[in-house]
């Protein structure tokens, strides 16, 4: 879910590198129709979803005759992630749009590679309660969460008192405070270290990304 975003593209790179380990069953994108079409033709999933209905016809026409089923809307994603042939769901959608389908994946006892931190910000208590009564397992794959997870493997949590979350330094880190009153959106989108989507780049510049994490 979120195949055309940064983490989605990286996930597909891994799937392409290890075809003996991974079969792509479903691709979900919001509005990036051209890239979704390209991904679908390359990986040949059973289903693709373009959440934005205005792009449905373009995707459907491009994939006509391929045997790939094309859907639109958000509700269908919850149905598709729960299908029996799916064993792992990568949730890399931006914002809260991944919440309903993550809940559906938990109910269906899927393994979940979670990059969508907003899901836990909004509904962490609900998600954690559901995990207790499900065979579903949640793996953090967003950068800091994944690093914390790997650092804690084999550790006794009783011996861990603090985790320190660092920041790589956005475009305003060394800027004089008085300059901040006149910065523009374009300034905020010029991250010095990473090429990311617009929303996460803005969130990084404002430090909101760290607050969510």
Positions of predicted regions on the chain:
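Short acidic-hydrophobic, aromatic-tinged amphipathic segments that line or gate anion-handling sites
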Residues: 49-51, 69-76
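Residue-level signal for inorganic ion chemistry
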Residues: 4, 40, 89, 109, ...
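Conserved anion/nucleotide-ligand pocket segment
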Residues: 147-210
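Rossmann-fold NAD(P)-binding glycine/threonine-rich loop
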Residues: 59-62, 95-108, 115-137
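Active-site-proximal loop->helix
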Residues: 10-19, 38-39, 120-135, 151-154
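Short glycine/serine/threonine-rich phosphate/pyrophosphate-binding segments
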Residues: 6-11, 34-35, 96-103, 114-115, ...
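N-terminal Rossmann-like dinucleotide-binding module
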Residues: 1-48
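Beta-loop-alpha module in the N-terminal Rossmann-like domain of NAD(P)-dependent dehydrogenases
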Residues: 72-104
């Amino acid at each position: 879910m979120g195949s055309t975003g940064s983490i989605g593209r990286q996930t597909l790179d891994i799937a392409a590198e290890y075809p003996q380990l991974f079969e792509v069953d479903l691709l979900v994108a919001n509005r990036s129709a051209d890239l979704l079409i390209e991904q679908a033709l390359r990986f040949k999933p059973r289903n693709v979803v373009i959440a934005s209905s205005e792009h449905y016809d373009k995707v459907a026409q491009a994939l006509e005759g391929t045997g790939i089923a094309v859907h639109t809307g958000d509700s269908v994603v919850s149905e598709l992630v729960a299908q029996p042939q799916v064993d792992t769901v990568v949730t890399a959608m931006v914002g809260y749009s991944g919440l309903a389908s993550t809940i559906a994946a938990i109910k269906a006892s899927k393994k979940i590679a979670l990059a969508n931190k907003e899901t836990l910000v909004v509904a962490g208590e609900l998600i954690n309660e559901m995990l207790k009564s499900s065979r579903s397992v949640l793996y953090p794959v967003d950068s800091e969460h994944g690093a914390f997870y790997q650092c804690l493997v084999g550790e006794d949590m009783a011996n861990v008192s603090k985790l320190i979350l660092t920041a790589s330094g956005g475009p305003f880190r060394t800027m004089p405070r008085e300059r901040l009153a006149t910065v523009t959106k374009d300034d905020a989108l010029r991250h010095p270290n990473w090429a990311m989507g617009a929303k996460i780049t803005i969130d990084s510049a404002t430090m909101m990304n760290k607050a969510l994490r």
